[in-house]
Design a protein with these regions (language model features):
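Alpha-helical support elements that line or immediately flank enzyme active sites
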Residues: 20-32, 128-150, 154, 228-236, ...
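Glycine-rich, N-terminal phosphate-binding loop and its surrounding beta-alpha-beta segment
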Residues: 43-103, 107
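A short glycine/serine-rich beta->alpha loop
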Residues: 10-13, 118-129, 220-224, 279-284, ...
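Short acidic, glycine/tyrosine-flanked loop/strand segments centered on an H-E-D-like triad
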Residues: 98-123, 311-328
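N-terminal, positively charged regions that mediate nucleic acid binding
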Residues: 1-58
Length: 361
């Protein structure tokens, strides 16, 4: 099982949904970076469960503890360890699925691969694994902010068939995003998204959504062609998030309907800095950052756990039916933005250090 991401600035996550704790070990962070538990906690609070009627009622404080790698408020250059203890597991809710496979979940595939699985809350495949990613991502964000002024913003751009239409990304702020219960800064769309989520929830169902990401002040020249291209690593990072089923950068799939004369971003110079007049490339050309903002979108499937009765099969090769129990989000996209930001930050921090290794200046 692969639980490590990154080459220089690398994170290893550990723990299961219903185990005693989850966490991460971050290696490769340079010494001297100011880091506090409060900084990391602020990020974890954005993905924490129990935030209201639109998220799972599982009540976890997700209080983070730094175990190593930070002394007197600064990184020491040694591995940074984070731990968050699980406090509100209801493992009895999963007793029925010890022998049945939940449709849409990783249960069957884990059994096919390992011949054994932790069925409580999905075990390692649970979204609680992303706690370690967010903790490490908070450090990556702080590092990139220090060295390059890089900023990350992510929001829900659609839920089901409801799309946001009036978001001015050039003036968008985190406060505007977090003011919405669905993390959509378009007030009209936000209200309709909330209604769509509650309607699905009332039927014992769930609903999917799309999460957008904007990264500003990205250093140019990040990315390692040909196989560690910036866009390829971002795709890998995003698609590794539980429930993420699609990725596009820049104009994405819309590029297939365009002509080159439309899609090419014209280049101009201002002082000694190159810019483009449009950003169909999404900040990456040839797998290398061009200094423009990174813009990408991720599709998140509907939460697999629903209370409606579904046909399934069991470990003893019998057919049956299952209505899943447990506490789950009716729309996972609502809690995904901070995870998306964290994974993007981990990619960029690692590529930044790789670029410093490759070049003298």
């Amino acid at each position: 099982m692969s639980s490590t991401f990154g080459k220089i600035f690398s994170v290893t996550t550990w723990g299961e949904s219903h185990g005693p704790a989850v966490g991460a070990v971050l290696d490769g962070c340079p010494a001297g970076l100011p880091i506090t538990e409060e900084m990391i906690q602020a990020e974890l609070n954005r993905r924490r469960p129990g935030q209201g009627k639109l998220t799972t009622p599982r009540n976890e404080k997700d209080t983070v503890k730094i175990l190593s790698g930070v002394f007197e408020g600064k990184t020491t250059g040694t591995p940074i360890s984070f731990v968050v203890f699980n406090e509100d597991q209801h493992s009895k809710d999963y007793a029925d699925i010890a022998k049945w496979y939940r449709p849409g979940h990783a249960d069957l595939c884990y059994d096919l691969k390992y011949g054994f699985r932790d069925y409580r809350g999905g075990g390692r495949s649970s979204a609680r694994e992303t706690i370690g990613r967010v903790a490490a991502g908070a450090v990556a964000k702080a590092f990139l902010k220090t060295v390059a002024g890089t900023e990350f913003l992510s929001w829900v751009s659609s839920v089901g068939t409801v799309d946001s239409t009036s978001i001015n990304v050039s003036e968008l702020t985190l406060d505007q995003i977090e003011a919405s219960p669905v993390r959509c800064p378009d007030a009209d769309a936000s209200a309709k998204m909330e209604q769509a989520i509650l309607e699905a929830k009332s039927k014992g169902d769930s609903i999917g959504g799309v999460v957008a990401l904007l990264v500003k002040n990205v250093p140019a020249a990040l990315g390692e062609p040909v196989f560690d291209r910036l866009d390829a690593l971002l795709a890998q990072a995003m698609l590794s998030i539980p429930a993420c089923k699609g990725f596009e950068i820049g104009s994405g799939f819309a590029a297939a309907r365009m002509h080159g004369s439309e899609h090419n971003d014209e280049i101009y110079v201002e002082g000694n800095t190159y810019h483009t007049r449009t950003n169909n490339a999404g900040g990456s050309l040839g797998g290398i950052s061009n200094g423009e903002p990174i813009y990408c979108r991720m599709a998140f499937k509907p939460t697999a756990t629903i209370s409606q009765l579904q046909k399934t099969a069991g470990r003893s090769y019998e057919n049956g039916e299952l209505a899943a129990k447990g506490r789950h989000d009716p729309c996972v996209a609502v809690r995904a933005p901070v995870i998306v930001e964290s994974m993007a930050a981990l990619v960029l921090a690692d590529l930044y250090l790789q670029q410093k290794r490759n070049c003298l200046d």
